[in-house]
Every structure is written in C-alpha cells, then in structure tokens.
Amino acid sequence: MMGQNQTSISDFLLLGLPIQPEQQNLCYALFLAMYLTTLLGNLLIIVLIRLDSHLHTPMYLFLSNLSFSDLCFSSVTIPKLLQNMQNQDPSIPYADCLTQMYFFLLFGDLESFLLVAMAYDRYVAICFPLHYTAIMSPMLCLALVALSWVLTTFHAMLHTLLMARLCFCADNVIPHFFCDMSALLKLAFSDTRVNEWVIFIMGGLILVIPFLLILGSYARIVSSILKVPSSKGICKAFSTCGSHLSVVSLFYGTVIGLYLCSSANSSTLKDTVMAMMYTVVTPMLNPFIYSLRNRDMKGALSRVIHQKKTFFSL
C-alpha cells in the first residue's frame, strides 16, 4: 500500500517543457491539436475495423489493438502536460506519479509486442501464402494479443512495485513532462541497484528481443521476395508490409535514439524532445501511415461513408 512506503514527500513537481511564457498559449494549442488528432485518428481506425467485415483479419486485429495502445499511450502523459500548462501547477501526487509510470510502461511495451505480432503476420502472409489461413487462426491471433497484454502488465507492475519500495526525501523535482522511471530513480534516497538491474535485464527482453524478432522476420521476408521472378510481384509484396515497416522504424528509431544513443552528458532538453517524439508524434502519425498507404483502409472508409449516406437518404 502507498501508505506503507517510506516516502517523506506527498507529491512531485514536473518541470515540463522548456517553454518561454510568451509561447505558452501557442504551445498549449499545438499540443492540444496534436492530442485530438491522435485520438480521432486512432479511434477512426478502431471504428473502421469494427464496422467493416473486410477488415476482420489477423492483421487488422493487431492494428486495432495497436491503435488502442497508441491512443492510451498519449493519454497517459499529454492531458497532465496540458493541465500543467494551463494551470501553471507542476505538482503531481506521489500515487498519481507511480500510476502514470505504470500505464506509460504498459502501453509503451504493448506497442513493442504488437509490432512483433504484426511482423510475424506479414512473414506468414508472404513466405507461406497458401497456409496463411491455417497458420494465422483466430485462436493464435487472440493468444498473441492476450500474451502481449499479460507480459506487458507483468513488466509494468514489476517496475512500479520496485519503485514503490524506494524512499524519496527532500528533492522532488522531476526534470521532465511526465513521471519518467529513470528520472524518478535519480531522486530516490534509498539503494536503487535492484531497480537498475531489473531495468537492464527486462529492457533486453521487452525491447531488444522484439526488435530482433522483427528484424529476423523481415530478413526472411526480403529473402522470399527476392525469389519472386516478376517485378510486379516484388512491388506487391513490399507494399503489403510497407506501412508496418514505417511504423516500426518510427517507433524503434525514437526509442533507440533516446535510450541507446544518449550519452552521459546528453542534455535534458534533448531527452525531453526525444521523449516527446515517441509519446506524442509517433502515436499521432501512425493512423496517417496506415490510412494513406493502405488501400484496404481507404476502401473501408469509402464503404462506411457510403453506407451512412444510404442510411440517411432512406
């Protein structure tokens, strides 16, 4: 329980973004617009997949869960950022901070696992097209989604419980716009070696292994594509996984840039900008990537609009 924790502080202070006072209103409007775009874009994908029977396939089951994850991922941090910018109150209660950290880890990790499931789906579709329906059965797809939720829930809960056992005294200023786990560890008064070891070990399992699995899937995909005799077949195969590859590059590019390429003397501003990329920009762009480069999504949108027009004309 929170009351049993040995903390001597009741809340933290989020420094937020390094924005000049005269730019506050403009930045507030910008982030609000980006957040609303993220909500509407991902909700549109979820609704289209739900309403259009043509999209009731394994790929779009994973995509609907990915859109839900993106929607929630942004909702974990951006509303609090907007509230702090509007009220000029940077405080966040201790329990709320740990809750935010938990859901941030949960939905961030969930996206990583769902991208692996989608890569496997594309691998089966291209390398074993005749056996696709048999391999990607509804039972397997639901099992992959359920396993993703279970593993990410366990991982997020593990880090949250380890953080809750730490003692925080005096210094409660977090140089970030959300309760980042690494920033919280720097404020801890007690020994954090267990936390750091778990981050190192679990980080490899949650981020590195999924990334390697995706690379392995695409290596097999490229190998199979190069065996296709016609250039038309090659283009069709690449277009099948183009959207997913774009999302993978966007997600892992920002995460790797933040956690693997950051040096000891990297600035807080740089870390904040990189974090903003994968918490705000990436979830906002994903719906555009899947809608603009995906004929199935465009067709589904046209059919749903046509059905609504027909309904209202009756």
From Swiss-Prot:
Protein location: Cell membrane
Gene Ontology, cellular component aspect: plasma membrane
Extracellular side: 1-25, 80-100, 159-195, 260-272
Biological role stated in the UniProt entry: Odorant receptor.
Primary subcellular site in the record, as a coarse category: membrane
One Gene Ontology biological process: signal transduction
Protein's name in the database: Olfactory receptor 1E1
PROSITE patterns: G_PROTEIN_RECEP_F1_1, G_PROTEIN_RECEP_F1_2
Recorded GO MF terms: G protein-coupled receptor activity; olfactory receptor activity
UniProt record similarity statement: Belongs to the G-protein coupled receptor 1 family.
Keywords: Cell membrane, G-protein coupled receptor, Glycoprotein, Membrane, Olfaction, Receptor, Sensory transduction, Transducer, Transmembrane, Transmembrane helix
Alphabetized Pfam families for the sequence: 7tm_4
Annotated membrane topology: Multi-pass membrane protein
